Curated annotation (Swiss-Prot):
GO terms for cellular component: plasma membrane; proton-transporting ATP synthase complex; proton-transporting two-sector ATPase complex, proton-transporting domain. The keyword DNA repair does not apply. Disulfide bonds: none annotated. F(1)F(0) ATP synthase produces ATP from ADP in the presence of a proton or sodium gradient. F-type ATPases consist of two structural domains, F(1) containing the extramembraneous catalytic core and F(0) containing the membrane proton channel, linked together by a central stalk and a peripheral stalk. During catalysis, ATP synthesis in the catalytic domain of F(1) is coupled via a rotary mechanism of the central stalk subunits to proton translocation. Key component of the F(0) channel; it plays a direct role in translocation across the membrane. A homomeric c-ring of between 10-14 subunits forms the central stalk rotor element with the F(1) delta and epsilon subunits. It comes from the Bacteria. It is found in: Cell membrane. Keywords: ATP synthesis, Cell membrane, CF(0), Hydrogen ion transport, Ion transport, Lipid-binding, Membrane, Transmembrane, Transmembrane helix, Transport. It comes from Mycoplasmopsis synoviae (strain 53). The chain crosses the membrane at residues 38-58, 89-109. The record marks E93 as: Reversibly protonated during proton transport. This is ATP synthase subunit c. Belongs to the ATPase C chain family. GO terms for molecular function: lipid binding; proton-transporting ATP synthase activity, rotational mechanism.
Length: 111
């Protein structure tokens, strides 16, 4: 039970903070509630967005290894192999670029 209480306290520390503002205009009272998502929640989201770069990195490493093997087997075809590898690496890199853009948007816009 103590672990659940610790987890609940940790989650409440990173939960959005809300505040209430009361405005009086011409005798009328208006209550407005504001919510501020903490920077901690945004940072966790940005970190999770960068998980998309893991698959891209693994795929590019595997492709580079296979490219070296192909050049080792047939050195005369290096120009065609290189061109194919560069195109494939560019396509594989798009996932990590999109993940990075999402992380930047969360950090700078998601406050």
């Amino acid at each position: 039970m103590n672990q659940l209480q610790n987890l609940a306290e940790a989650l409440s520390a990173s939960s959005p903070v809300s505040g209430t503002v009361q405005t009086v205009v011409d005798g009328n009272t208006t209550t407005t509630t504001t919510t501020n998502t903490g920077l901690g929640v945004v940072a966790v989201g940005a970190g999770l967005a960068m998980i998309g770069a893991i698959g891209s990195g693994l795929g590019q490493g595997y492709a580079a290894g296979k490219t070296v093997e192909a050049v080792g087997r047939n050195p005369e075809m290096i120009s065609k192999i290189r061109a194919t590898f560069i195109i494939g690496a560019g396509i594989a890199e798009t996932a990590s670029i999109y993940s990075f853009i999402v992380a930047l948007l969360l950090i700078f816009v998601g406050k």
